[in-house]
Amino acid sequence: MAPPPSLAPDRGGGEPDDALRLRARAAAAAGDAPAPQQQQEQRHQEQQQQLLWYRASAPAHRRVRESPLSSDAIFRQSHAGLLNLCIVVLVAVNSRLIIENLMKYGLLIRAGFWFSGTSLADWPLLMCCLTLPTFPLAALMVEKLAQRKLISKHVVILLHIVITTSVLVYPVVVILKCDSAVLSGFVLMFLASIIWLKLVSFAHTNYDIRMLSKSIEKGVTHDISIDPENIKWPTFKRLSYFMLAPTLCYQPSYPRTTYIRKGWVVRQLIKCLVFTGLMGFIIEQYINPIVKNSKHPLKGNFLNAIERVLKLSVPTLYVWLCMFYCFFHLWLNILAELLCFGDREFYKDWWNAKTVEEYWRMWNMPVHKWVIRHIYFPCIRNGFSKGVAILISFLVSAAFHELCVAVPCHIFKFWAFIGIMFQIPLVFLTKYLQDKFNNTMVGNMIFWFFFSILGQPMCVLLYYHDVMNRQQAQTNR
């Protein structure tokens, strides 16, 4: 067996082995094959040469080389083996923690926190949820009146403002009037927020379609290529499809697939159920015991608060990743498959985000497209600077995060609002660090630390203790 080329000494004035082999192959290709005697002589020479390769006097070090983990060579190496090691260690450590938790606490699955004893009797929330589709129908009626020019442009805008405002105020009033479970209120506010975003897009897009139609009638198109499929008037069928489709941006037509993969849908539904159960297990077995044994992070000892936040960071990260996979990958793709919705870019590789700004652009594509289309670029077109447009976008996002969390919890401490607005300085900080150090890893690590290790566990502790304090105060009355 031939040694590595680095251990083979120079042959002096002789011809290298590689050259001999190349000459032999070239001669064979040309039809001038060596005679058997020549082949035997060649093999004998190779055997004699191999004896020299393993002599003690043969040099073992022949060139300058870096260690694989040195700073100059580490990024040129493949670390697949280390990644496999990390996965094995992660599985082993988490398996031990699960077994230890079950041996210490037993199975803690309960539904009291999510579904109270009155959850099935929360008929006001159920009735509110069932009546939410009336708001899209009202928006369609407004567009029909505008299409027939029975109402003016300003009246159309006013009616859409009334409809979109009502679709948020109505569920908020119902939830605050009823002492419902947290999960029931969250689901209702989540649906109401989605309908609000869709109706704003519906109204804004149709307003722009009317403006484009008037420009076409006048022969003024501003040199913009207009697809006739995207300037059609709204119909009940188009609105119904839009309200069910996994998108927040209205348009008269969407890219469609040709058929439904029924077996694929069943597999995704099974995965969705499995990961939903996993989320519930982590919450009940890990997150609830940790927060129960903690104090309010703003009232207790600082070191104890840091210890609780760090202990809570891993399970909350797992729950958040499961939630992302269940909703953005499984559920939205299931909806897209059932509706033959073609554009399924619901997220990008946000885990590789180099800055906080990149993360917000990549992790939730339906909301990102909505913000770009209906907030950011309209602000730019109206003369606002880029920084002001970003600030307004974050304000809207922070307001909806606060609504979806604070209203179901019946607590208005603005923790979610502050958490989202705190992302603005992080946007500029990570952008500055990336430009200063020309290193993509710095911003990525800052994003993971503030978002997953510090931000989410802190919000969980703050809201949990506020909810528990509110429930305790109600019990003492």
Swiss-Prot record:
It is found in: Endoplasmic reticulum membrane. It is an enzyme of class 2 (transferase). One of its GO terms (cellular component) is endoplasmic reticulum membrane. Residues 12-21 have a biased composition (Basic and acidic residues). Keywords: Acyltransferase, Endoplasmic reticulum, Glycerol metabolism, Lipid biosynthesis, Lipid metabolism, Membrane, Transferase, Transmembrane, Transmembrane helix. This is Diacylglycerol O-acyltransferase 1-2. It catalyses: an acyl-CoA + a 1,2-diacyl-sn-glycerol = a triacyl-sn-glycerol + CoA. One of its GO terms (molecular function) is diacylglycerol O-acyltransferase activity. It is a multi-pass membrane protein. Involved in triacylglycerol (TAG) synthesis. Catalyzes the acylation of the sn-3 hydroxy group of sn-1,2-diacylglycerol using acyl-CoA. A motif (FYXDWWN motif) lies at residues 346-352. It comes from the Eukaryota. It holds the Pfam family MBOAT. The active site is at H401.
